[in-house]
A protein has these predicted regions:
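N-terminal leader/linker segments that precede catalytic domains of diphosphate-processing enzymes
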Residues: 1-277
Length: 277
């Protein structure tokens, strides 16, 4: 989930640093997110959610309940990993954590949802809220090549950070968080100050040219979401992850590629490289 806010130097995105001991991409800076749980499907109903029809239409290639569950999962994972709850009250406004008592209550809810003792549906029912699925704009669809028996089929969404909520890492799966512009994140990665997985790098490259959150959202709403399935090859003993648009990948990309269309795994991290034959 890309959570954006307007900053002095352009849109800033909220990123978290994965725990070093995480089996996959430990220590990397990523966007909050996770997987779909059974409870997400249980909450995927009109009485709990706004934007049900649009959510189903966004991912029309899936059964509607699965498409809606993807959106619910994005909301839940954002709450668990960043403490941001995309839900509205009866007045139509996003829930506010400005009041200390409310903030403490929802902070405990966040822990309980993470621990499995509480569901997102429990919270919205208790508080009289509705999950704001209509606040999520589909951004990308990535399917990673199988590596060490792991393969990920991931949907990226983008949203504007709600007022009166301050995201922060969970201090469990993630150990650090930061608001940062796409350009700054890329520069820090180039300087080996942070690690960015290839899909994260590519996403940041796509949004770094925009001056406001409104511009990012408008562009995202108009783009065609296609399945991105990088190819993993080995050249001269080096692992390469090739994106559509690279000379070694036959298919044409839906969007014009960035100058980097491949990533080389060097010294324990993926490094973006310009296309070459």
């Amino acid at each position: 989930m890309l959570v954006l806010r307007d900053g002095e130097s352009g849109p800033e995105v909220f990123m978290v640093r994965r725990h070093e001991d995480t089996a996959f991409m430990g220590g990397a800076h990523v966007f909050p997110g996770g997987r779909v749980d059974a409870a997400d499907r249980e909450a995927a109903e009109p009485r709990w959610c706004d934007g049900i029809a649009d959510a189903a239409a966004h991912l029309a290639e899936l059964p509607s309940v699965d498409a809606i569950a993807y959106h619910v999962a994005a909301v839940r994972e954002l709450f668990e990993e960043a403490g941001v709850l995309l839900a509205r009250g009866e007045d139509g406004h996003f829930v506010s954590f400005a009041d200390a008592a409310d903030r403490a209550r929802f902070t405990q809810d966040r822990r309980d949802v993470y621990g499995g003792g509480l569901s997102l549906r429990d919270i919205v029912e208790r508080e009289g809220l509705r999950l704001a699925l209509d606040a999520l704009v589909p951004f990308a669809h990535w399917v990673t090549p199988p590596v060490d028996v792991r393969q990920f089929d991931t949907r990226f969404f983008v949203t504007r950070a709600p007022a009166h909520q301050a995201p922060v890492h969970d201090d469990a799966e993630t150990t650090h968080s930061v608001w940062i512009t796409a350009a700054d994140a890329i520069a820090r990665c180039r300087a080996d100050e942070i690690v960015l997985p290839p899909p994260t790098w590519t996403t940041l490259r796509e949004i770094e040219r925009f001056l406001t959150v409104d511009e990012v959202l408008e562009w995202t709403r108009q783009r065609r979401i296609v399945r991105r399935e990088p190819k993993l090859v080995v050249q001269a003993g080096v692992k390469l992850l090739l994106l559509p648009g690279d000379p070694l990948v036959p298919e044409r990309p839906a969007d014009p590629p960035a100058s980097e269309t491949r990533f080389a795994f060097i010294n324990g991290r993926w490094r973006a490289e310009a296309a070459r034959t």
